[in-house]
Amino acid sequence: MSLPQDLLYSKEHEWVKQEDGKLRIGITDFAQDELGDIVFVELPEIGEELKVDDPFGSVESVKTVSELYAPVSGKVVEINDDLEDSPEYVNESPYEKAWMIVIEPSDEKELEELLSAENYEAFIQD
């Protein structure tokens, strides 16, 4: 299982990458592996305001549909349109090609609630 050390993680299995005051968000390798083959991804509209733990979309696999939850509050400023035509990217490249949204955070202190790679690894092994 791939677990980049430079990212932050939520207990809902989203990853967060800090980039120039914005946050790029996707689901973890662990999450995509648990879901199986992804066949559809639903994402929010650009401009949508999210609060921490709000559902912001869903991923549908051959097994189930799973909600996506905002790891931090903020405004959606970019979505990954490639996932509409290529949902399999979530399985193939969860940390690169399959990022889902970029948000401008409204409260950066919420980042302190997220897990380091080491703590996320311990969380998923429990």
From Swiss-Prot:
Record Pfam families: GCV_H
All copies of domain Lipoyl-binding, residue ranges: 22-104
N6-lipoyllysine sites (modified residues): K63
SUPFAM superfamilies: Single hybrid motif
Protein's UniProt keywords contain Lipid biosynthesis: no
Obligatory cofactor(s): (R)-lipoate
General function of this protein: The glycine cleavage system catalyzes the degradation of glycine. The H protein shuttles the methylamine group of glycine from the P protein to the T protein. Is also involved in protein lipoylation via its role as an octanoyl/lipoyl carrier protein intermediate.
UniProt family annotation: Belongs to the GcvH family.
UniProt-recorded name of the protein: Glycine cleavage system H protein
Organism the protein comes from: Oceanobacillus iheyensis (strain DSM 14371 / CIP 107618 / JCM 11309 / KCTC 3954 / HTE831)
